[in-house]
């Protein structure tokens, strides 16, 4: 029996299967299909509107000209059989599974090159062809509130408090058991420096498994909170108060060769960082203004940046929590880069893809890494989404690596589906109210 036939047999054990496609905003879109029919979609794909990747945060319609688009027709969303996993929290007594999908045009059956998962796999393939593997994980922050009052489940900045954690243990332990049963591996949880703010640290994974798992984690947290007495949000800045703590999603990653050796560690270097690590840092620093569009992809994200202890200036440093790129150099297995730019609303597939594209540019071109720390020549990150999108469009190397279709669609999605909604608003209070409507849930 082939692997595909084995998976089809496994699918038949479920009552229902969710077929989920990640759009440009990091939202799962798809359909729930009966388990007895689900296997056929592995061969034939699932019909969805051909522009669904472009949907805005609240499914605002964004349209783009493309030679393969025809009369607002359909494309095909194909499940990846390797992503089959149970989703135990959906309904008691009903067996539900999920598979993650990628989109293809009906004309010719070729990939939609703006599909975030496809773009991430394409960049991972570039690494594989060079003999490298990406090993990565996330620190996912989320804010938890009481559903009846919408007040945070705790106030203050009592980070790491076991007492605060204990008060929410019943909810968190229920959530984590379901996550574990769904093959979503969270290593640890703790309260963070902000009212109602928690962090979930995922177990690092190789390749596409990391962004797959992180999106499943975020989806699971929101879905389980929907049936509990709490509300969970990943909105970057859910309060108008500038002093309120923003919500991030730090991306930790390292490179390894096929023999299992760290490519970022060098025992003989004074700082234990290899030449490749320095070149990679140089690459992501060079492209950081453009990367900001993917790392902080909403209008609201820029309320989080340029605040104390949040990214503002473009520099790196060893164990430096004010740097955009915080470097850990604790031996071969503990040497990695912590990208502190990503917002809680960022799309993990696009973070992985753009990070690889920028880092490889540094390695291939052997870029020289500037010294760590901030100087008078240090440049700042963009202050608005509009500015970040302009930087992305200007970054020819990044556009070439990621593909013009992705960048064109992403920019169109953001300008027409989000930025345009704020042009008629006069006050910051009005703008924030619209941000909360768009990004809170």
Specify the residue positions occupied by each region the protein language model found:
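Short, hydrophobic beta-strand segments
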Residues: 99-105, 198-204, 253
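Beta-strand elements of well-folded, non-transmembrane domains
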Residues: 105-107, 146, 206, 257-259, ...
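Acidic/histidine-rich catalytic neighborhood
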Residues: 247-271
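ATP/Mg2+-dependent ligation/transfer catalytic cores
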Residues: 1-188, 209, 213, 230, ...
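C-terminal accessory/tail domains of diverse enzymes
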Residues: 2-10, 22-27, 209, 220-234, ...
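Active-site-proximal beta-alpha loop/turn segments in soluble metabolic enzymes
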Residues: 144, 152-162, 195-210, 239-246, ...
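Short, contiguous, pocket-lining structural segments
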Residues: 163-171, 188-194, 206-217, 221, ...
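Core alpha/beta catalytic barrel or barrel-like domain that forms the active/cofactor pocket
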Residues: 134-146, 182-202, 232-252, 291-299
């Amino acid at each position: 029996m082939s692997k595909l036939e084995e998976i089809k047999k496994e699918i038949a054990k479920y009552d229902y299967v969710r077929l989920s496609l990640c759009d440009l905003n990091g939202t799962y879109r798809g359909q729930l299909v009966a388990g007895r029919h689900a296997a056929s979609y592995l061969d034939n794909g699932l019909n969805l509107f051909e522009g669904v990747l472009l949907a805005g945060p609240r499914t605002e319609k964004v349209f783009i000209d493309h030679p393969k688009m025809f009369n607002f027709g359909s494309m095909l969303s194909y499940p990846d059989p390797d992503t089959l996993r149970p989703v135990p929290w959906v309904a008691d007594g009903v067996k539900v599974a999920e598979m993650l999908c990628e989109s293809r045009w009906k004309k010719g059956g070729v990939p939609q090159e703006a599909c975030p998962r496809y773009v991430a796999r394409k960049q991972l393939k570039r690494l594989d062809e060079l003999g490298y593997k990406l090993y990565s994980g996330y620190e996912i922050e989320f804010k938890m509130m009481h559903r009846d009052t919408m007040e945070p489940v705790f106030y203050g900045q009592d980070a790491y408090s076991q007492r605060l954690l204990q008060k929410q243990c019943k909810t968190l332990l229920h959530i984590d058991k379901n996550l574990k049963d769904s093959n979503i591996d969270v290593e640890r949880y703790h309260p963070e420096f902000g009212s109602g703010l928690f962090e979930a640290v995922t177990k690092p994974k190789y390749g596409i498994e990391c962004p797959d798992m992180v999106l499943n984690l975020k989806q699971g947290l929101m879905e389980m909170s929907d049936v509990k007495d709490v509300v969970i949000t990943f909105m970057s800045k859910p309060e108008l108060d500038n002093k309120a703590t923003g919500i991030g999603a730090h991306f930790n990653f390292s490179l390894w060769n096929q023999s299992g050796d760290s490519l970022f560690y060098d025992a003989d270097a004074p700082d234990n960082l290899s030449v490749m690590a320095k070149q990679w840092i140089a690459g992501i620093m060079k492209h950081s203004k453009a990367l900001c569009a993917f790392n902080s992809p909403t209008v609201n994200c820029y309320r989080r940046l340029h605040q104390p202890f949040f990214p503002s200036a473009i520099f790196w440093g060893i164990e430096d929590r004010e740097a955009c790129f915080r470097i850990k150099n604790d031996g071969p297995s503990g040497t990695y880069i912590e990208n502190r730019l990503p917002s809680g609303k960022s799309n993990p597939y696009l973070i992985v893809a753009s990070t690889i594209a920028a880092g490889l540019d540094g390695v291939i071109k052997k870029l020289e890494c500037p010294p760590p720390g901030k100087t008078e020549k240090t440049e700042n990150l963009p202050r608005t989404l509009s500015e970040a999108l302009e930087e992305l469009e200007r970054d020819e190397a990044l556009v070439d690596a990621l593909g013009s279709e992705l960048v064109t669609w992403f920019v169109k999605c953001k300008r027409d589906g989000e930025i345009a909604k704020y042009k008629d608003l006069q006050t910051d209070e009005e703008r924030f109210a619209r941000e909360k409507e768009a990004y809170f849930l």
